[in-house]
């Protein structure tokens, strides 16, 4: 039986640019780094790895990745001020949540979502 998803890899075109985005812009803690690969810890629950070999642009069939935050509107404003490319402003989602959609430098898409704990 599958217990949980614990590792997520995202392909990027420029590892240094991607590390800067995920570490310095999004504030993720880097665990390890190699010339073509880097690993970030997401609150001890999931590992996000970035690796070279990607092509720019959203890939058909790519999974949606949701990152939970305490306040979507606050994070939206902070990240927007840092130049993050938001595809969709914060809004109520059809599934009942509240979220915003942004892209990394390689146009991989991510949601910031606010949930009730």
Label each residue range with its predicted role.
Residues 16-29:
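Amphipathic alpha-helical segments
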Residues 29-62, 109-114:
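Conserved short beta-strand elements that form part of the metal-binding/catalytic scaffold
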Residues 1-17, 63-65, 116-117:
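N-terminal beta-strand motif that seeds the catalytic metal site of vicinal oxygen chelate
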């Amino acid at each position: 039986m599958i217990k949980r998803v614990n590792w997520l890899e995202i392909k990027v075109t420029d590892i240094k640019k991607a590390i800067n985005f995920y570490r310095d812009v999004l504030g993720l803690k880097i665990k390890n780094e190699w010339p073509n690969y880097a690993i970030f810890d997401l609150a001890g629950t999931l590992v996000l790895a970035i690796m070279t070999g990607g092509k720019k642009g959203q890939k058909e069939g790519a999974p949606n990745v949701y990152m939970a935050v305490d306040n979507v509107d606050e994070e939206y404003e902070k990240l927007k001020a840092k130049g993050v490319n938001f595809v969709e402003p914060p809004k109520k989602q059809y599934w009942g949540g509240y979220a915003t959609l942004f892209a990394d430098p390689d146009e991989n898409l991510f949601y910031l979502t606010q949930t009730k704990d």
